[in-house]
């Protein structure tokens, strides 16, 4: 299997005045093409911090994060942003959709950040993927006009519209009731498999984690036996 993402000896320390807090200690992780991995841990275990480092949203205190053979933490923010937009999709517990934009406009936005994609092309690709998540009748609706499950479907469509090689998902169903959570994760899994995109998700839900190919337990910033 080819590695999409590789992290080695990741440490993260936050300094607040004279107080230093080590959140992550000596973590290694490899994500292979098409793989589905769940990172499980309680609140405060460092899951979201790790996801931010792997996605180039922050840099480790020490250690290396490689994405498609390129060292993220040697890049400036503009370069990391370009790598994120090219290779990664993000899904969060709270959808982070822009309230003033329609579903189509929200989903098209990552494509419009690419100079080679026209507005018309971006819109059509957004419509196509919204159709694939069952929202063909909600294209012109704004987030406030959608249900919680529908908003998360829009977020999934936005994450996948650029055809990323890896999706990073932070509690992707954590804000939904059981039935909606099952439906949304089933949809995400189906699209991830169809598009041959790798998925790395953090969750506190072991039932959800059981659906992944691999489960990793993060406790107090260290890997432990799952």
Curated annotation (Swiss-Prot):
Localisation: Cell inner membrane
Any single GO BP term: protein localization to outer membrane
Record's protein name: Lipoprotein-releasing system ATP-binding protein LolD
Keywords: ATP-binding, Cell inner membrane, Cell membrane, Membrane, Nucleotide-binding, Translocase, Transport
Annotated ABC transporter domain residues: 5-226
Gene Ontology MF: a single term: ATP binding
EC code: 7.6.2.-
InterPro entries per the UniProt record, alphabetical: AAA+_ATPase, ABC_transporter-like_ATP-bd, ABC_transporter-like_CS, ABC_transpr_LolD-like, LolD_lipo_ATP-bd, MacB-like_ATP-bd, P-loop_NTPase
Record function comment: Part of the ABC transporter complex LolCDE involved in the translocation of mature outer membrane-directed lipoproteins, from the inner membrane to the periplasmic chaperone, LolA. Responsible for the formation of the LolA-lipoprotein complex in an ATP-dependent manner.
Superkingdom, taxonomy of origin: Bacteria
SUPFAM superfamilies: P-loop containing nucleoside triphosphate hydrolases
Membrane topology summary: Peripheral membrane protein
Record note on quaternary structure: The complex is composed of two ATP-binding proteins (LolD) and two transmembrane proteins (LolC and LolE).
Family: Belongs to the ABC transporter superfamily. Lipoprotein translocase (TC 3.A.1.125) family.
Top EC category: translocase
Positions contributing to ATP binding: 41-48
One annotated Gene Ontology cellular component of this protein: plasma membrane
Source species: Psychrobacter arcticus (strain DSM 17307 / VKM B-2377 / 273-4)
